[in-house]
Amino acid sequence: MKWVLTPEEFAHVWATETEVDRPPYPLNMIAETTADTGPEPQRLRSRYARNTDPDLTAAMLLCTRPDATVITVSGQRRAAGEPEQILLFAAVVHQHAVVLIARPEAVTVTGCHARGLGERLVAEIGTAPAGSTAGMREPQRAVLGTGDGHTEGKSTAGASRGAARFRRKLRSPVEGRGFVTVTVAPDNPMSPPTRHRTWLDFTDDGRYLLVTAAELALTPVDDAEFAAQLMRMACIC
């Protein structure tokens, strides 16, 4: 299932079908509503009356379910030298997934099986080879320069060199970067905490995933591993 709507059409359909005024983050950064007067709103109300397309209605309502696992993606990449925003929202309930893809000129609504969600999201983010540098893990305070950076099992000099190497890598130029947030079944008290990842596509190198916690971890990933990590974060088997 796939629908391609203008931002105005999407905003109207979203509000009509879900009774929620604003689209979800990060689509609210691009979708615009029109004034409720004049010919355009009248056209929208006529063409997209409630439940005109039951499949589209079901897709919209799935995105608002309190038991839905939600993945949000916001970032930027360079396409033909020009920066391009990446704004994605995905919701999963059982084996059903819906992906909302926002572009300046259109919002695409797609449905897919939950097992294919990771690959679908990576395809929208854009393909990239795995980075060529081995994975790194260092204390956040050492990398950011806010502590002595001592790590158990490492000498002070070794920890300092590792933190400096990590810092140099993070300062390297990038062609794309973005932020992923995954909230698993928020109405379930047994769900894991919300999870976050940053992807970095370094110029003349490749893609890495960055985990920020007490320790920073930078791991090279290709498309398949990126998709697999998204699926693990969302607890989709």
Task: Enumerate the language-model features and the residues they cover.
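Short, surface-exposed polybasic-aromatic patches that bind anionic ligands, especially phosphate groups
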Residues: 1-237
